[in-house]
């Protein structure tokens, strides 16, 4: 309401008195005066403080961390520049390595004095140098000249200097696999063979892999004869000749023998390994037989009608049963001896069984002392110490006062030292007494020593003495050396508080150290190292601070007294334990006490007051009060100090909480307790992985990852002892403070390090003792070793030092000291020693030579080459000749080669480096051209020099390394940029002395991967057998692959990186595969476009290999399946994208990477030697990485090798003594390029202007456009868009969704994004109050360039695409400014931000396409030079021409662009083909036979998906899997069958399951069966799989998997029957007749989890995707073998109607039922497989094993055809022909000549009979017992159908026929039971089979068989009514147990019988 006008306002307010108004006037005046005075005072104050020219400035911002995000490799660390704080560089650590002489060999073929020097060289050279082995390079294998026999094997010593022949002490962990010994005995493994040979001292060696006689165990097969193939040694099951059909059609064979028929002849020939041929039909005649008797085992052979005796027919099998003959020769079996008799035409009688060469062992009669074992070394007996012990720590104290880890280690040391050492007592010795403050006991001297070496770690700590130490290790070393008590007071540098340092967690407050209090500690008691239980970890730290003592957290939970419960014995003696504790703590145990059994009766009132400080930080009035408190609390409590407790607090305790890790700069680690040391959880235990025993804590240096190691402990993770230290185990077992110093005597030891388990040092010859300080009697240890002169020199005049040592007078004695290892930086280059070994530098060479007492001098600077002649003590000639030659031939620097005498002058181009504009601070050698040198006397020396120019000993293992950025740069080809010309190097074609890996040789390796090539043609390379493979790859080593045109160039950097990764991965896979024994190398030949990337590789094998291309492909597929999934990603299905072909033999060599194209090779071969060729592929060194090396400034590298034939660069060279002019003097850079000299004239680089490129800027480079692949991005500096932004962008997209641009705020809501969503551009931004969303109306067309423009001003924004009317939008009101602080990401975002960006923009993928222009605020971003402009990039490529422009698709079809310039047309309905040009579908009409489904491929073709039973391209081949032949499924490891789920076959499968499977395995592992609940591997499942030949039955009911594993491994190549049973949570597994293995799934307290819920299909033999199977099944590969039977409660599942899908499954043709020779069952019988054998189901009218017997029809009215009227019950004895008793039931006496044995416990039953009836019910046959619920077997008619039912004691089985029998016609019935399996066949129907549940296999009966019914059924049998009804009808031709039953004569009870009437 507006105020009233002044004139209308009333003069007085109603209700206001005059008195009030009177007093209001002066108050208002007072208020006005007060305000006026206050304002004046403020003005005066401002004027008095104001000074012109002075103003406040904000504090300067904290300078950014220039090292953040900068990665340094190979041990270098980032350091900011002192001169320019805004710049940083990677530098190597300056600290010196320890002076420890422990030579090691690096992968660069150089010897370093210790591992630290190797790592230092690796950092300085910025290249990967791996530790190949301990000991110097070039040292010979100590086992090379040692021959071990009689079971022993050669084992080199730890220092690699000597070797011993040792017998295997245990075979645990050795590879299993039966081997055949030379004595003809099978052994479970080769290790056990050697162990037996050692024990018996017999000369036994491995003869073959596998058993000596593979046919052993197959002799009992009545249907087959086993023969061992002599070539493959595989058993072959051949049919017996006696089983041939009884056809009398005699034929005459070419051996002069008449055979019954052709079947008999062929089978007899096959069993003898012969191909007998038919000469004529009928009997053999006289002219077909040899005229004379063949002697000496020769066999008659008829060829061209001329019979003669021949030895060619004496063929022997491959079984090994050695026979020693009289001629002293051992034959593999007696047949080979007979063959030798035939060929030599003389008698060679056998001498004895077994081999002949059973020479007695030289060890017979040899007695070894000190526990040594006699072994045979080089044919002589030697006593060797078996140094291998189990490693179980059970310390004992020896009689020498030394503690040994076990009795075995004591005996081993006694043997090694050659002295008698007895076990003095159990437990460790204590020769030093108590070593305090972290010192360790030195047993030899009995004194305590301090480990002094610490690994540098940037983790300073503050000690309790107030000093800062570089690391916790340095603190403990200081405490040990000064023998003082010192603890870590706090992490970081010491901070003073007043005049003192706050320790043990105290904080500084107001100049005083105050212990923080725990206000609200998290619950959870912890046990402190003082034995006190604290309520929380916070209270533990508070107590440590108050008491000023070190208290660590021992473990979570309360402290359990060691006296009670710690042993976990569970003996129930808690009362006794509590009584003991009560007494120990001053109490009295009284069980009758009302206050508790432990009575604390202390009277402390009369004790004089004397305050004491308790260990809990509480002050007690007297010590008595403390003891009373200890008794009442039952806690450890003791007097910490006399007097009142004094904490560090000089003020009352403040409620200061310990700072939580969340308040630290980098937040918390994953444990939510430890503070992170840097971004990305740097320094956290989860990323450091520090060894808990070797490190002080789980944290590490965030920059280097170095953990804080204990003294003497080294490694990044503190997991090993440093060189010169040993006994890491002592830290764990004995609580040592660190590793123990080796303390090797430098006078007697060769090295300063020692064996890690024993501490033994490597001694010089003649020196003994564990520390190499002992000499034989009468000698003393001097500077030359053990010396006879007892006089000790006093002055250096009396001593002569050798091997580079210098004399030093010290402590009154003179001694020789070897030189130090440290060299000045100027002399830190590699040198070649006179022994042919490369050393890290000259100082290391001298130190190693001195310690090893070898005369080694420096041969030359730089690494040794192949032509250096080795020699430890070179002669003067060998030393002077090369130098003399070099002085004449090298008038200018060593990196260029002069003309040799007599050669002509040539023009040489200026060498160019690979990467232009590169300044390197690390020394590099540049490769210069090499001239052809005539083969003069100096040829070898010139060759050596030429080789050194082109090679600088690259890493031998470089191709497989993850950090390869420096390997090839340091090699000649990499740094110089030129490759040696073909034919320019003259090399003597002798066998080179291999000093390093051939990868360091100038011409690389041959195809065998180990022979260095001597020339460009590979003339010295051995032949290989090559297989060419084609692989479709999706990724390698975790990196996704996308094809770009640069991959086609073998010289490109991208090709080199990709080839390295692929070759390294394939090499690892093949070396662990089934073909590894013959594998040599793999080389990438070509990369090309495919579905993703197509790689063509050549895999080289031993030329004698028996492997075929299919073997190579299968082996690689198996390895890909079982290897880690990111190693090599191949397109699915694997078998379609991994193909191998035979490629013939290759004598050609391949170098370290690949060979390049054929054209390039041809060019190289045709090039003359006078000029360096433009393209040479021979040395194929991979290009370097694009990552920036240490200490260099790198311009963008070119992707192609610069040409070397430009004429403007050629200039003559003449020999002379002057230095060559600088490379840039001739101004070689064109078009304004800037030339820069490299390394003092060794080369130059051109820095080209924009738009120019090439080695001399001669090429015009089109503007580069970045291409994005959906997971790529470019990062630029943050947008300046607080209030205004204008942006324009041009892009081309291949997909309708993707992120174009994004910039956000890391801590707030603000962001700006530009994205494609549903085919339209969307602009989003959020200023903090909510997002604004602007969507364009113009659809984005894939493949077309679009331009968008947007603007934003405060909260308003506009968007326009392709000139459309701008779309306007506004963000919600609230905040207006846009605060951005992250990088501007273009084309995508980093992976860690995907979730956040997806939530804000609804787009989680990047752009697939190109961006060619980006304008921000009228300033265009240089995308053409994005490599330099972007601050970060990932996966960005070059944008090329679009494959879909113009549109190649017909009919307006949409073109979808693919990688590598390919496209895919999405054809509309009615169009087909790759370009939609065909209007007719290739599937119309359907070309697939058998109505198989047809699928149209994207390439335009058709693919037929063949069902089970058909194969071929169009399913035109019908496989004989149905009908008369049974189907046995053959799996190859990648095939599988998909069936209906198990739950569809059995209703109550969830409760219980009984399954049986019969299979034959070829491979040791694979999936046999799997059925799950869900497709993602979660939920319930059941599986059966092979794991290393062990069967594993697994199932999960919801709480966890039950794993039931067979006890014994199964045999490969044999049929195996397995039974599975599950009832609730309990399961059982039984293999064959073996024992049952029981198991149970986990139990749940809340839910029973007893039901198996299955919903998915059943997979047999494999699965389509193993990653989607349950993890509990633990399967990753398919089954290789044959599956014969999968039976679920007797129901066969392997039938066509149950199979839903079959992939690569073929029928097995090597079973008697499926073989090509035909059905073994005659007269139309059905063959039923029974594992390796079979059974014939005969049709009506036939019987016998092969249905060969016809039944004789009885005459009408004969009593053999009986009639039954429903009351006729006839009893017979259960008669069989052969006894099949499994228990000891005696057979009854024979009744008469025709009576048979009566059986009561039967393993099998067989019945055949013919019946005729019209009845629908009735019991036909019964056998069983009369007891309640006893076993039985019955044939009955139920509802007109015949049933066979039997019960073996577990559960009845009912088999029902599908044929009606109540037809009044004669039908033949056949019923059979074998163990638990049964079958029923009526007439000609297919047999109905079934199986009883897992359990009993025999039928227990009373010995009687009833026909026609029973008077009364047994009680308790739940049988249908039909079983209680008698049979009405006729029976005849009854067969019991394959024998005819005489119905009248064999009857025991004979009621009135009558014949069956005629129908």
UniProtKB/Swiss-Prot annotation:
Residue spans of biased composition, Acidic residues class: 960-970
Disulfide partners: 92-123, 97-116, 105-137, 165-198, 171-191, 180-212, 244-263, 252-284, 309-342, 316-335, 324-356, 385-415, 389-408, 397-429, 448-480, 454-473, 462-494, 508-545, 518-538, 527-559, 600-631, 604-624, 613-645, 688-700, 690-707, 709-718, 721-739, 742-754, 744-761, 763-772, 775-786, 816-850, 823-843, 832-864, 1224-1235, 1229-1246, 1248-1257, 1410-1439, 1483-1494, 1488-1504, 1506-1515, 1713-1727, 1721-1736, 1738-1747, 1930-1956
Residue numbers on the Cytoplasmic membrane side: 1-26
Protein's GO biological process: cell differentiation; chemical synaptic transmission; circadian rhythm; enzyme-linked receptor protein signaling pathway; motor neuron apoptotic process; negative regulation of sodium ion export across plasma membrane; neuromuscular junction development; plasma membrane organization
Topology, Extracellular side: 48-1959
PROSITE patterns in UniProt: EGF_1, EGF_2, EGF_3, EGF_LAM_1, EGF_LAM_2, KAZAL_2, LAM_G_DOMAIN, SEA
Gene Ontology MF term list: acetylcholine receptor regulator activity; ATPase inhibitor activity; BMP binding; calcium ion binding; chondroitin sulfate binding; dystroglycan binding; heparan sulfate proteoglycan binding; receptor ligand activity
Effect of residue 1806 to L: No effect on formation of AGRN-LRP4 complex nor on MUSK activation
Effect on the protein of changing residue 1751 to A: About 23% reduction in cleavage by neurotrypsin. Reduces cleavage by neurotrypsin by about 90%. Completely abolishes cleavage by neurotrypsin
Site label Cleavage, beta site, positions: 1754-1755
Protein role: Isoform 1, isoform 4, isoform 5 and isoform 6: neuron-specific (z+) isoforms that contain C-terminal insertions of 8-19 AA are potent activators of AChR clustering. Isoform 5, agrin (z+8), containing the 8-AA insert, forms a receptor complex in myotubules containing the neuronal AGRN, the muscle-specific kinase MUSK and LRP4, a member of the LDL receptor family. The splicing factors, NOVA1 and NOVA2, regulate AGRN splicing and production of the 'z' isoforms.
Protein name, as recorded: Agrin
Encoding gene per record: Agrn
């Amino acid at each position: 309401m507006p105020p009233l006008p002044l004139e209308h306002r009333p003069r007085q307010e109603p209700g206001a008195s005059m008195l009030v108004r009177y007093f209001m006037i002066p108050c208002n005046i007072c208020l006005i005066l007060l305000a006026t005075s206050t304002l004046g005072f403020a003005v005066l104050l401002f004027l008095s403080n104001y000074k012109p020219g002075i103003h406040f400035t904000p504090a300067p911002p904290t300078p950014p961390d220039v090292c953040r995000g900068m990665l340094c490799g190979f041990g270098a660390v980032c350091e900011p520049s002192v001169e320019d704080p805004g710049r940083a560089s990677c530098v190597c650590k300056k600290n010196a390595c320890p002076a420890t002489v422990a030579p090691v060999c690096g992968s660069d073929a150089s010897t370093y004095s210790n591992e630290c020097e190797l790592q230092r060289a690796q950092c300085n050279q910025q290249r990967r140098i791996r530790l190949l082995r301990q000991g110097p390079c070039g040292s010979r294998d100590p086992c090379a000249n040692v021959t071990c026999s009689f079971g022993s094997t050669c084992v080199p010593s730890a220092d690699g200097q000597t070797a011993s022949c040792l017998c295997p002490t245990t075979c645990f962990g050795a590879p299993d696999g039966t081997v055949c010994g030379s004595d003809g005995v099978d052994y479970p493994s080769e290790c056990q063979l050697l162990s037996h040979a050692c024990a018996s001292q017999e000369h036994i060696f491995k003869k073959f892999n596998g058993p000596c006689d593979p046919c052993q165990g197959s002799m009992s097969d009545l249907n087959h004869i086993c023969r061992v193939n002599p070539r493959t040694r595989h058993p072959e099951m051949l049919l017996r000749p006696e089983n041939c059909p009884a056809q009398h059609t005699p034929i005459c064979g070419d051996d002069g023998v008449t055979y019954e028929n052709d079947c008999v002849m062929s089978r007899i020939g096959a069993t003898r390994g012969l191909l007998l041929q038919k000469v004529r039909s009928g009997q053999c005649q006289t002219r077909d037989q040899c005229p004379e008797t063949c002697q000496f085992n020769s066999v008659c052979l008829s060829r061209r009608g001329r019979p003669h005796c021949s030895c060619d027919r004496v063929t022997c099998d491959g079984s090994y049963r050695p026979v020693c003959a009289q001629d002293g020769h051992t034959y593999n079996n007696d047949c080979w001896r007979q063959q030798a008799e035939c060929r030599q035409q003389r008698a060679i009688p056998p001498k004895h069984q077994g081999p002949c060469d059973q020479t007695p062992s030289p060890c017979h009669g040899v007695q070894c002392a000190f526990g040594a074992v006699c072994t045979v070394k080089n044919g002589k007996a030697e006593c060797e110490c078996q140094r291998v012990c189990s490693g179980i720590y059970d310390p004992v104290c020896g009689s020498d006062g030394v503690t040994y880890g076990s009795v075995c280690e004591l005996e081993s040391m006694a043997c090694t030292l050659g002295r008698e050492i007895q076990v003095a007592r159990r437990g460790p010795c204590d020769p030093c007494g108590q070593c305090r403050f972290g010192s360790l006991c030195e047993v030899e001297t009995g004194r305590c020593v301090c480990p002094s070496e610490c690994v540098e770690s940037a983790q300073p700590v503050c000690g309790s003495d107030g000093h800062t130490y570089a690391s916790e290790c340095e603190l403990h070393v200081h405490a040990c050396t000064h023998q003082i008590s010192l603890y870590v007071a706090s992490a970081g540098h010491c901070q003073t508080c007043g005049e003192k340092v706050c320790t043990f967690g105290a904080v500084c407050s107001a100049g005083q150290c105050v212990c923080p209090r725990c206000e609200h500690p998290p619950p959870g008691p912890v046990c402190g190292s003082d034995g006190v239980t604290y309520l929380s970890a916070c209270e533990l730290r508070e107590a440590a601070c108050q008491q000023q003592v070190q208290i660590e957290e021992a473990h979570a939970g309360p402290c359990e007294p060691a006296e009670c419960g710690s042993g976990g014995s569970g003996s129930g003696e808690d009362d006794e334990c509590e009584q003991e504790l009560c007494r120990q703590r001053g109490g009295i145990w009284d069980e009758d006490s009302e206050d508790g059994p432990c009575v604390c009766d202390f009277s402390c009132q009369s004790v004089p007051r004397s305050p004491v400080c308790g260990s809990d930080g509480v002050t007690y009035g007297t010590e008595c009060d403390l003891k009373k408190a200890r008794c009442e609390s039952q806690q450890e409590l003791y007097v910490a100090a006399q007097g009142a407790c004094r904490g560090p607090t000089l003020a009352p305790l403040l409620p200061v909480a310990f700072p939580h890790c969340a308040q630290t700069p980098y937040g918390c680690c994953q444990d939510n307790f430890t503070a992170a040391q840097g971004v990305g959880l740097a320094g956290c235990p989860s990323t450091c992985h520090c060894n808990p025993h070797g490190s002080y804590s789980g944290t590490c240096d965030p920059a280097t990852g170095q953990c804080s190691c204990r003294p003497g402990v080294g490694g990044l993770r503190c997991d090993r002892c440093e060189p010169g230290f040993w006994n890491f185990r002592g830290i764990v077992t004995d609580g040592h403070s660190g590793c123990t110093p080796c303390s090797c005597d430098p006078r007697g030891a060769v090295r300063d390090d020692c064996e890690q388990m024993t501490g033994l040092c490597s001694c010089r010859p003649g020196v003994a003792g564990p520390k190499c300080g002992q000499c034989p009697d009468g000698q003393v240890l001097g500077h030359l070793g053990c010396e006879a002169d007892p006089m000790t020199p006093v002055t250096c005049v009396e001593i002569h030092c050798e091997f580079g040592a210098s004399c030093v007078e010290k402590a009154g004695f003179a001694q020789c000291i070897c030189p130090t290892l440290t060299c000045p930086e100027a002399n830190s280059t590699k040198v070649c020693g006179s022994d042919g070994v490369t050393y890290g530098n000259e100082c290391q060479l001298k130190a190693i030579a001195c310690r090893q007492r070898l005369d080694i001098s420096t041969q030359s600077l730089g690494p040794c080459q192949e032509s250096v002649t080795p020699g430890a003590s070179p002669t003067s000639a060998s030393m002077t000749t090369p130098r003399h030659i070099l002085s004449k031939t090298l008038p200018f620097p060593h990196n260029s080669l002069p003309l040799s005498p007599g050669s002509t002058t040539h023009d040489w181009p200026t060498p160019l480096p690979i990467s232009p504009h590169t300044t390197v601070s690390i020394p590099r050698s540049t490769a210069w051209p090499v001239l052809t040198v005539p083969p003069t006397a100096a040829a070898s020396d010139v060759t050596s020099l030429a080789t050194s120019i082109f090679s600088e000993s690259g890493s031998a293992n470089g191709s497989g390394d993850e950090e390869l950025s420096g390997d090839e740069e340091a090699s000649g080809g990499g740094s110089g940029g030129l490759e040696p010309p073909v034919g320019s190097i003259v090399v003597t074609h002798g066998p080179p002395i291999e000093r390093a890996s051939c990868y360091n040789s100038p011409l690389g390796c041959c195809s065998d991967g180990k022979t260095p090539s001597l020339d460009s043609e590979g003339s010295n390379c051995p032949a290989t057998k090559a297989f060419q493979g084609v692989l479709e790859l999706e990724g390698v080593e975790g990196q996704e692959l996308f094809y770009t045109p640069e991959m086609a160039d073998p010289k490109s950097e991208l090709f080199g990186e990709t080839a390295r990764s692929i070759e390294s991965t394939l090499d690892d896979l093949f070396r662990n595969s089934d073909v590894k024994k013959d594998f040599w190398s793999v080389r990438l030949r070509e990369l090309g476009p495919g579905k993703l990337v197509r790689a063509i590789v050549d895999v080289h094998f031993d030329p004698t290999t028996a492997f075929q291309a299919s073997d190579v492909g299968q082996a690689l597929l198996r390895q890909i399946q079982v290897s880690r999934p990111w190693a090599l990603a191949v397109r699915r299905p694997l078998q379609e994208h991994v193909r191998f072909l035979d490629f013939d033999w290759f004598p050609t060599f391949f170098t370290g990477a690949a060979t390049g194209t054929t054209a390039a090779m041809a060019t190289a071969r045709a090039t003359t030697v006078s000029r360096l060729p433009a393209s040479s592929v021979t040395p194929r060194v991979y290009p370097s990485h694009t990552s920036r090396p240490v200490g260099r400034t790198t311009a963008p590298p070119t992707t192609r090798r610069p040409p070397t034939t430009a004429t403007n660069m050629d200039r003559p060279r003449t020999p002379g003594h002057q230095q060559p002019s600088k490379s840039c003097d001739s101004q070689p850079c064109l078009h304004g390029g800037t030339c820069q000299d490299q390394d003092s004239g060794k080369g130059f680089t051109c820095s080209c202007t924009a738009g120019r490129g090439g080695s001399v800027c001669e090429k015009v480079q089109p503007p580069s456009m970045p291409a994005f692949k959906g997971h790529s991005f470019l990062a630029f500096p943050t947008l300046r868009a607080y209030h205004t932004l204008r942006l324009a962008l041009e892009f081309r997209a291949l997909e309708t969704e993707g992120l174009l641009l994004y910039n956000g705020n890391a801590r707030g809501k603000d962001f700006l994004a530009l994205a494609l969503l549903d085919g339209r551009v969307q602009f989003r931004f959020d200023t903090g109050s909510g997002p604004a969303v602007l969507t364009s109306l113009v659809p984005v067309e894939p493949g077309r360039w679009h331009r968008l423009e947007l603007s934003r001003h405060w909260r308003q924004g506009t968007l326009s695409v392709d000139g459309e009317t701008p779309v306007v939008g506004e963000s919600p009101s609230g905040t207006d400014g846009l605060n951005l602080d992250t990088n501007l990401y273009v084309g995508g975002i980093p992976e860690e931000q995907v979730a956040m960006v997806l939530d804000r923009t609804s787009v989680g993928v990047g752009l697939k396409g190109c961006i060619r222009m980006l304008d921000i605020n009228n300033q265009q971003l240089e995308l053409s030079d994005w490599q330099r402009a972007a601050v970060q990039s990932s996966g960005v490529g070059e944008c090329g021409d679009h494959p879909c422009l113009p549109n190649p698709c017909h009919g307006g079809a949409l073109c979808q662009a693919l990688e590598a310039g390919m496209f895919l047309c999405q054809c509309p309905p009615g169009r087909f083909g790759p370009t939609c040009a065909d209007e007719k579908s290739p599937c119309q009409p359907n070309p697939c036979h058998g109505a198989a489904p047809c699928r149209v491929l994207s390439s335009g073709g058709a693919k037929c998906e063949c069902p089970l039973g058909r194969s071929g391209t169009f399913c035109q081949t019908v496989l004989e899997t149905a009908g008369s032949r049974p189907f046995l499924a053959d799996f190859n490891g990648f095939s599988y069958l998909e069936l209906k789920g198990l739950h569809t076959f059995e209703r109550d499968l969830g409760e219980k399951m009984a399954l049986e499977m019969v299979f034959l395995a070829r491979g040791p592992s694979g999936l046999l069966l799997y059925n799950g609940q869900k497709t993602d591997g979660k939920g319930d499942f059941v599986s059966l799989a092979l794991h290393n030949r062990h069967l594993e039955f697994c199932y999960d009911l919801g709480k966890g998997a039950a794993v039931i594993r067979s006890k014994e491994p199964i045999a490969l190549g044999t049929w195996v029957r397995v039974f599975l049973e599950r009832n609730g949570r309990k399961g059982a597994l039984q293999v064959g007749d073996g024992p049952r293995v029981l198991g149970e799934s986990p139990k749940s307290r809340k839910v029973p989890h007893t039901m198996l819920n299955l919903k998915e299909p059943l997979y047999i033999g494999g699965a389509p995707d193993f990653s989607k199977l349950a993890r509990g099944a633990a399967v990753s590969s398919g089954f290789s073998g044959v599956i014969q039977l999968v039976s679920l409660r007797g129901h066969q599942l392997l039938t066509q109607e149950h199979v839903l899908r079959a992939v690569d499954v073929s029928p097995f043709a090597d079973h008697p039922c499926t073989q090509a020779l035909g059905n073994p069952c005659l007269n139309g019988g059905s063959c039923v497989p029974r594992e390796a054998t079979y059974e014939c189901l005969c049709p009506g009218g036939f019987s016998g094993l092969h249905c060969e017997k016809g039944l004789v029809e009885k005459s009408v009215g004969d009593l053999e055809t009986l009639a039954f009227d429903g009351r006729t019950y006839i009893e017979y004895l259960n008669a069989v022909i052969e006894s099949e008793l499994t228990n000891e039931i005696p057979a009854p006496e024979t009744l008469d000549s025709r009576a048979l044995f009566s059986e009561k416990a039967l393993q099998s039953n067989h019945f055949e009979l013919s019946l005729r009836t019209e009845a629908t019910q009735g019991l036909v046959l019964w056998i069983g017992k009369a007891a309640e619920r006893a076993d039985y077997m019955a044939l009955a008619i139920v509802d007109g159908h015949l049933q066979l039912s039997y019960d073996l004691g577990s559960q009845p089985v009912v088999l029902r026929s599908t044929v009606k029998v109540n037809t009044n016609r004669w039908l033949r019935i056949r019923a059979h039971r074998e163990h638990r399996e049964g079958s029923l066949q009526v007439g000609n129907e297919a047999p109905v089979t079934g199986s009883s549940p897992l359990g009993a296999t025999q039928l227990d009966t009373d010995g009687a068989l009833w026909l026609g019914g029973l008077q009364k059924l047994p009680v308790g049998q739940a049988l249908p009514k039909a079983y209680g009804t008698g049979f009405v009808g006729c029976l005849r031709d009854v067969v019991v147990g394959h024998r005819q039953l005489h119905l009248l004569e064999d009857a025991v009870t004979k009621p009135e019988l009558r014949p069956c009437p005629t129908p």
